[in-house]
Amino acid sequence: MREHWRTFKIAAWLGWEMDSNWTEPALFILYSVIKPVASAFILVLMYFILFAATGRPQDPAMFAYIYVGNAFFIFVGGTLFGTFQVIQSDREWYQTIRQVYTSPISFYTYIVGRAASKVIVAGLAVVITLVFGVAAFGLQLSVSPWNLPMFVLVLFLGLVCLISIGLCLAGISFMTARHTHGLAEGIPGLFYVFCGVLYPLTALPAWVQGVGTAIPLTYWFQLTRALILPESTMQSIDTGLGSDSLGILAILVVSSLAFFLLSIGIFKLGEHLARKAGKIDMLTSY
C-alpha cells in the first residue's frame, strides 16, 4: 500500500508539472479562471437563443438544472481525457513509456496519479463555474451542512466511476495507435446526450431513456443536483429517476464498484495483449 501511495504522489506531481509548465503560474491560474467562465457564457447564450426561438418563457428551474449539469460535466471530459491519454502521450509524444513501465511501480496506479492533476483543475473549473453562475446569473444553490458528507461521498463515487471508465479506455489504448482523441471527444459526447446533462431523460424517446438509466453517471448528475439545488427546483422537473436519493445512491455505489472491478480486468487484459504483441512501447509516428 505504501508503494502505491508513493507512486500515486509522484505521478500526480508529474501530471501537474506537465499540465502547467507551458506558462507562468499566474497566467495558468488566469487561464483556469477564464476558460470555465467563457464556457458558461456559451451555455447561457445557447439557453436564451433556444427559448427565444421557441417562443417559450424562460424557466429558472430548468436553467438551474442545465447550468449545474453542465458545470459538473467538466469533470467528465477532464477526468476521462486525463486518464486514458497517458499511454498515448508517454508512448508517442514523450517516448518515456519504456522507462516508466519497466520501473518497479504499479502502472495502473501511475495512470490514476497522472489523472489527479486533471481532476484538480476540473474541480477548480467547476467551483468557478458555479460561483460565476450565482454572481452573474442569479443561480440559486441550497447547500445544507447536513448534506455535505453525502455530497462528498457522491462526488468521490462519481470520480471513481469516471477514472474507472478512463482506465477501461486506457486498457484499450494499449492496442490502438491513433484513436485517443476520437475517444476523448466521442465517449464524453455520448454521456452528454444520454446522461441528462442538459435535459431530463424524459425529454428523450423511451428506448434512449433505457440507455441513460444504464449509465452510472446519470445517477451521479441527479444526486449532485439534488444536493445543491433547492428542493422546489428538483420537484418542478420530471427527471424520470424518482426522488429517492438513498436508492439512487445505492445504485451509484454498486455501479461504481462494478466499473472499478471492470477497469482492473480490462486494463490487465489490454496490458497482457499489448505485451504479447510487443506493442507496449511501439511507436506509430503519429
Task: Give the ranges of each region predicted by the language model.
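Hydrophobic transmembrane alpha-helices and immediately adjacent juxtamembrane helices
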Residues: M1-Y286
